[in-house]
A protein has these predicted regions:
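Flexible, compositionally biased loop and terminal segments
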Residues: 1-198
């Protein structure tokens, strides 16, 4: 494989929309959660491969704002899987010099997923904030995890933030440019994807 890609132009930013894990499992007569677990294994391998190939940004859209409409049982299972996956991802990121950044609305997640308060429990849990903090100095690929993310939701939150800054006198409406709007988005500082795969 290495020889085959030697002369190819590697995209700077690849984005993956994770879709169909539940259907994959159902087609094989397995519970949907098995499909989600297999999806995580695939993402882990993809992170390592993308970092090795020299891709600068890899974005995975893994849990959209629409996913909260699934059954409480499935959402609960996905949150447990997310907790487990964050711990594994920290090891992978450190091993591969990968910086991790999460985009999306964090407000709906349980506090242990967002930030660990006090001492770590005996089984070390990794929060999103800890994962971002501990990989912030890594200089390799940036792995962007889009969770509880939706484009319309992102724009809505950005506009609200801009309006508050206008009310506080930090922003003058007449001075708002495309770059100003971009700076309020979750994706500020992240280039647009060159390749989107679903």
């Amino acid at each position: 494989m290495e020889r085959d890609i030697e002369n190819l132009v590697i995209p700077q930013h690849v984005a993956l929309i994770l879709d169909g894990n539940g259907r994959w499992a159902k087609k094989r007569g397995l519970p949907r959660t098995v499909g989600h677990k297999q999806g995580c294994v695939t993402v882990e391998q993809t992170v390592e491969d993308a970092a090795r190939l020299g891709i600068r940004y890899l974005t995975v859209y893994g849990f959209s704002t629409e996913n909260w409409k699934r059954s409480a049982e499935e959402v609960g299972a996905l949150m447990q899987l997310f907790r487990f996956y964050l711990k594994r991802l920290l090891k992978i990121a450190k091993k591969n010099n990968v910086r991790v950044k999460m985009i999306g609305d964090r407000t709906r997640f349980d506090s242990d997923i967002i930030d660990m308060l006090g001492e770590d429990p005996p089984i070390v849990m990794v929060s999103i904030n800890r994962l971002e903090d501990e990989t912030a100095a890594n200089t390799g690929m940036t792995f962007v995890i889009a969770v509880n993310y939706g484009g319309r939701d992102e724009i809505t939150r950005a506009v609200r933030h801009m309006m508050m800054d206008c009310q506080d006198g930090k922003l003058v409406p007449e001075n708002v440019t495309e770059q100003t709007v971009a700076s309020y988005l979750d994706t500020a500082g992240i280039p647009d994807p060159d390749l989107l795969i679903r």
